[in-house]
């Protein structure tokens, strides 16, 4: 499902706050979850099967509880409470990963829009994140993975992870190889058939706040704007000057990015 990630930049801030709450506090009210489910399904390019599966399992558990008489319920109450806690943790983990994935899809599309405007690849932005240090011999990482590349790989993972190979023995599709390699280097485990966006978000925010991700992302935007203005048309030149002086969030720039988003 094609989405317009730039229709409302305020949505990114709201989504960021939900991610932060789910990831750090690990608790979201049932009423908020219902909104979150519909929001993710509408705004992401993923089918969000993780969330749907966990929700179905929990609903089945509640239906079973309702069929028990009071004596059976009391006898199995402790067991149900334990199961309920486990399902809640699993559901919130899936929710956190899907929220993180939706964020990466938005950021990836926005970076692509910026890149198309200034005719410069986002991978050239001189911003990196420190990968996990590999323990295996011969797999030491010497260079940081660029933040733009990590966002791109995580966005692709969320969009298409269900179509990636289920085991390392199966050769992935050509379009997935680059993303899988980046995520493997970042996380130090095989990233096949799994949504790892929550782990990528935690890695990027390690030792810092999640807000730092947005500061780094805005720096990518500033770097992308740092190109010779004589190579741009007059309208884009005026927009970039305005962006540099006022920041990324202004109505005219949003429309320009939305028109050029991929």
Predicted regions located by residue number:
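Eukaryote-skewed repeat-based solenoidal scaffolds used as protein-protein interaction platforms
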Residues: 90-100, 104-118, 122, 126
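Acidic, Ser/Thr/Gly/Pro-rich intrinsically disordered interaction regions
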Residues: 1-57, 63-97, 134-262
């Amino acid at each position: 499902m094609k989405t317009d990630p730039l229709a409302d930049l305020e949505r990114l801030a709201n989504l960021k706050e939900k991610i932060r709450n789910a990831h750090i506090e690990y608790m979201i009210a049932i009423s908020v979850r219902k909104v979150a489910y519909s929001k993710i399904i509408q705004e992401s390019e993923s089918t969000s099967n993780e969330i749907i599966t966990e929700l179905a399992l929990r609903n089945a558990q509640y239906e079973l509880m309702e069929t028990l008489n009071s004596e059976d319920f009391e006898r199995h109450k402790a067991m149900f409470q334990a199961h309920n806690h486990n399902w809640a943790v699993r559901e919130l983990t899936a929710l956190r990963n899907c929220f993180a994935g939706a964020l990466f899809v938005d950021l990836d599309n926005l970076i692509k829009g910026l890149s198309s405007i200034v005719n410069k690849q986002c991978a050239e932005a001189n911003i990196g994140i420190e990968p996990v240090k590999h323990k295996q011999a011969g797999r030491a990482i010497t260079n940081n993975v660029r933040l733009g590349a990590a966002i791109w790989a995580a966005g692709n993972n969320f969009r298409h992870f269900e179509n990636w190979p289920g085991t390392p023995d199966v050769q992935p599709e050509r379009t997935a190889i680059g993303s899988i390699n980046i995520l493997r280097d970042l996380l130090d485990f095989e990233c096949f058939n799994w949504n790892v966006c929550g782990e990528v978000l935690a890695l990027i925010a390690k030792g810092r706040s999640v807000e730092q991700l947005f500061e780094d992302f805005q720096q990518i935007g500033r770097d992308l704007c740092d190109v010779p203005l004589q190579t741009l048309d007059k309208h884009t030149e005026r927009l970039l000057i305005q962006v540099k002086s006022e920041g990324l969030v202004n109505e005219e720039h949003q429309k320009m990015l939305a028109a050029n988003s991929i």
